[in-house]
């Protein structure tokens, strides 16, 4: 499959199955937002370095976002044909990760957390927005 059409886009793009939709279609907007998050998570993975305790979690989240994006880009009539599945129930996985991080944080927090501190922290704040 080529990544270009040589025909100009005329404000349209393809989704799974070859259907043409407007570039301002909610599915394209949603996937653009998910792709931005995925890119920031990738940047965080590079910044923290190999072997960091967050690597596995961030990689899981990136893979999961790609699966979600594939479903967003699949028309309802073709959803059953999409072979992409999440590796684990995302709510269970995320709750386990939240519990892990909550155990490391001293509660109750009485202050707002200002974005920044260091580059990784700042990128984590960008990801959450």
List the predicted regions and their residue ranges.
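Phosphate/pyrophosphate-binding loop motifs in nucleotide- or prenyl diphosphate-using proteins
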Residues: 1-129
């Amino acid at each position: 499959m080529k990544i270009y059409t040589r025909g100009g886009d005329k404000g349209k793009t393809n989704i799974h199955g070859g259907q043409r939709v407007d570039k301002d279609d909610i599915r394209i907007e949603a996937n653009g937002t998910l792709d931005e998050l995925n890119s920031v998570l990738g940047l965080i993975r590079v910044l923290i370095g190999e072997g960091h305790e967050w690597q596995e979690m961030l990689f899981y989240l990136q893979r999961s976002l790609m699966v979600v994006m594939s479903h967003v880009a699949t028309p309802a009539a073709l959803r059953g044909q999409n072979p992409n599945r999440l590796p684990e129930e995302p709510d269970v996985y995320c709750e386990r990760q939240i519990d892990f991080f909550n155990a490391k944080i001293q509660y109750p927090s009485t202050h707002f957390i200002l974005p920044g501190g260091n580059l990784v922290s700042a990128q984590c704040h960008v990801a959450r927005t």
